[in-house]
Amino acid sequence: TSGTQMVKDIRPGYPSSQTYNPYDGLSSDYLYVLGNHVYFAANDGTNGTELWKSDGTASGTMMVKDIYSGGGGLKNFNTMTVLDNNIYFTANDGTHGTELWKSDGTTSGTMMIKDINTNILSSGSNANSFTSNHVMTTTENMVIFSANDGTHGNELWKTDGTAAGTALVMDLTPGSHSSMGYPWSSVISHMTSMGDLAFFYVDSNSAGASSYKAAFVTDGTPEGTFAIANSSSLGYVSSMTGFTAIGDQMYFVVGGGGSNLYVSDGTIN
């Protein structure tokens, strides 16, 4: 294609198929590449927000699958990630609640990986495994993400794309307080991959849980999941942000009485 042009008017008229409202579509920031297609969330005005793909042509721009007929199945589309020949995302099919899905770009190859939270809510609907602020990233051989199985709260999980290979990595905050997900419990954020490792920030500061802020690293195993820098040793910490991998080094900024640059190879001194 030469020049600069709109690929396709997915939802003719107004509102558009892509907006800055996460419940209607997506912002232009949220585009994911798999093979020679770009994947994104869009609403054509009929099917709700679903997974779409485009090869850069109008005829090659299409909905991958209507996951939730009439309801819009795609959820939290700003945390999609790609591993091997599949794109991973969260979706609600109207039966299982919001769960982990994957797609190879075909209708038949778009499927739920595992129903992580099988609990039934008082409303009669299925519980969601994913909150609106869950995180997800890809290492060299797995997807690392946060999820709630209804027992441990929002915690650290991994998947290789199979139900059997989808498992809890570690309960970072044992008991009723989760390590991730809600303002009244701990929160995980800034998840960033480096080779076969994933780095992330945990802020555990809720009623009943001790105040603890730390940068963590994980290789997808319990023994390989630990804090590389924490408020116990650093003193006052207000935040840890800016996780950026360069080669085999992860850089991040620790805030608290000023901001300081840190670097880690994933080990503790």
Question: Which residues does each PLM region occupy?
Answer:
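Feature 14080 marks short, conserved micro-sites in well-ordered regions
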Residues: 1-269
